[in-house]
Amino acid sequence: MKIEPLYDKTDFVIIQDYLSKCGVKDVNLWLKHKYLDDVNNYANIDEFCKKLYNAFTNKQKIYLLVDSDLDGFMSSSMFYVYCHSVYKDCCINPIFHTGKQHGLDNIVMEEIKQYKPSLLVVLDAGTNDVKQDKELKSLGWDIICADHHEREKINPYCTLVNNQISTKVKNKSLSGTGVSWKVCKAYDTKYGFNYANGLISYVAIANIGDGMSFLTPENETFRYWGTRDIHYNLKPFVCDFNGYLTDNKSFSFGMVTNINSLIRLGTQKDKEILFYALCGKIEPEEIICVCKKLHSKQSRDTKSLLEKDVDIIYNGKIILARVSKSTPLTGLVANKMMGEHNKPIILTQRDGEELKGSVRSPIDLKDILPSNLFNYNLGHQRAFGTSYQISNEKDIIDYIDSLESLPEPTQAVFMSLRTSDVPNYLFGFVDENKAYFGEGIPIPKVHFQKFGIYNKEIQLLGANQRTVKFHRDGIDFIFFNCTNKIKELLHLNDLSKKRVTLEFIGELGYNEFRGNKTKQCIIDMSTLDIHDYRIDFM
């Protein structure tokens, strides 16, 4: 395990120190929660607003492509709410993907071409859909797009608002919903409305859900104000999925993952109902239940795929793997595999002579892969969709073999400590500052140096005996979902007394139960290193 401690055990750290260490350039500005990039710094934003205004005044039907992830649903539902605020009688027709596609894929294109040409709005996608936009333009369509993905080619066929191509915009880590909000704010300014500020909850949640960096003061501004007073359309989702909690972690494991489950596994009708519930047009209780059921199904299906349907084709510096059945869960499965192997994963499924799927990596990878061997690699540097021809797979493997090395994944940790050396203040540090932790500013975790422990000191808890707990130096150490393999390594079923060596990374905090407050460490199981105990005499 290669670790990089940020601090020494003798350091006393305050949140300002930690923010600076993570990469916040101006901590005082960041903590004021008041910074926003000027909407006028966005290229083409005035033209976008004019085309939208003309569509309203001419009573055109507006077609809105709802991209197939949380950021896509947030941007589109926010835009729908905004449009109906400024022009109550506007006619907006949402278009939904059939799966986890993005932008103007072939199926969406066939649907659009059935309609009478009008205005098409594409949010959180579309930057590189040059061929599709050219075809639609020739048929009489007008296309306006607000996106945050990197531009790979010039697109003269749509009006594109994008933070990546706007040289005056500082925040390159804003979500698609954030860029869409900029358009709404610009429309407010240009035509004398004041509705955009009330919609920042959509941006805050999308920034979390799409893994946007919180090192930028603008994203912290959206988080701070967007979660202080959740928009009434979104409150039922936040209350049910998050248990009323509004820190980034609660969103990531609550509302974000549940909604993404429906987007992956739900029917077209489910997606439509979810969209209108996020818009506040229908009551959300039923679709919230559907999200929960599909999230449970997603967990079961991911586990089953990993155990039964994934074959590793090549295990080198990068793992190439194939899933034998069609599934929308390649991203989740690849993420699990990355945690297990601690190296980049390219997981695909066969579609004729093409292999399509997902890439997950602990290092920046997208730009390392040779574009001439892939049909596309679309997304972020460490998480993106991929496609290549089967005939290219050998060349891809040869290319990976030719790489001298990849950067070794490094685990950045708050401190590296012995169990006896943990400063008391660290147990309250996370709870006191949890609102600030997110992408780029991770929850502080501690690396625990190797120590020996007897199997008889370790407890198995819970009805399924899958929770592991042991007590050491005044701290309760816990991890969940213990596998049979780990039970064997820990000798938990052995009758004889055996000693093992443990090393791991964990998150510190306090556990309160019936008025008792105890120190606790939740172990990150993907970092758990177990060996039979031995003494080195030389």
Predicted regions and their residues:
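Hydrophobic helix-and-loop "lid/oligomerization" segment in the mid-to-C-terminal part
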Residues: 2-119, 139-140, 188-401, 412, ...
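Short alpha-helical basic/polar micro-motif
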Residues: 178, 331, 335, 504
